[in-house]
């Protein structure tokens, strides 16, 4: 839990592979091949420390949005991500309740994108810290809204709670009779709700819904009561989603 809260997976992985990539990029420069730095697209403007930090923050938030949608759309990834959504009582620690493999996959993609974009190590650490700080706040069990306009600029606890709502955050259309629920969900944005607005996944309703996963309530499915049982059951669901084992 503490490892996730501090973003240590991403930070350690970033600094672990940086020497290897520095060597590789050095070889490319020797061969006359340039390297890409996103903050260099407008010299004198985008390469300033604050401007580049803002650019990278927006880019990585978009990456987070895409990853978050994948966690819900792909059954094998949802099998792991469900650990995060299975907590019925939202708290600031809910953000840190994850399957370890889910965290590792997320970190690997983040670091891969960071290295491709050429972000400075100090800015990578800053973006990880900013993201973790606000994610913790968004999971707090408080009725906090930023108002009509503020909700469309920055993700609030109310906006994110709808993402955790039973039959809403993971399902675009709820189950009706014998008709199964349609996966899709709402409010995947991590810091910025812009992406949800752009891609039609935003829900700005002022409801304060119960949180969790539908089959916890309707079928009593067990997602684990402690860390080790959550990890074990997550791997079991993953194997089933990949067709490697049968449901029992």
Where are the regions a protein language model picked out?
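Membrane-embedded catalytic scaffold of the fatty acid hydroxylase/desaturase
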Residues: 2-211
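Cytosolic-facing loops and C-terminal tails of multi-pass membrane proteins
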Residues: 197, 207-248
């Amino acid at each position: 839990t503490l490892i996730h809260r501090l973003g240590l997976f991403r930070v350690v992985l970033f600094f672990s592979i940086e020497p290897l990539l520095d060597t590789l990029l050095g070889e490319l420069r020797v061969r006359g091949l340039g390297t890409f730095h996103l903050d260099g697209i407008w010299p004198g403007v985008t390469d300033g420390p604050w401007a580049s930090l803002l650019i990278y923050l927006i880019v990585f938030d978009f990456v987070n949005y895409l990853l978050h949608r994948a966690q819900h759309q792909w059954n094998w990834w949802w099998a792991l991500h469900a650990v995060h959504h299975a907590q019925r009582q939202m708290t600031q620690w809910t953000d840190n309740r994850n399957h370890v493999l889910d965290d590792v996959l997320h970190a690997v993609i983040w670091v891969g994108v960071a290295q491709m974009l050429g972000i400075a190590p100090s800015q990578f650490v800053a973006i990880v810290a900013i993201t973790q700080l606000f994610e913790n706040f968004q999971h707090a069990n408080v009725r906090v809204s930023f108002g009509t306009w503020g909700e469309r600029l920055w993700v609030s606890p109310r906006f994110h709670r709808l993402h955790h709502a039973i039959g809403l955050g993971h399902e675009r259309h709820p189950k009706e009779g014998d008709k199964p629920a349609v996966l899709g969900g709402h409010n995947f944005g991590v810091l910025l709700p812009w992406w949800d607005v752009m891609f039609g996944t935003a829900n700005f309703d002022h409801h304060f819904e119960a949180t969790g996963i539908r089959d916890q309530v309707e079928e009593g499915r067990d997602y684990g009561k402690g860390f080790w049982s959550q990890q074990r059951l997550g791997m079991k669901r993953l194997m089933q989603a990949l067709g490697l084992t049968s449901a029992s």
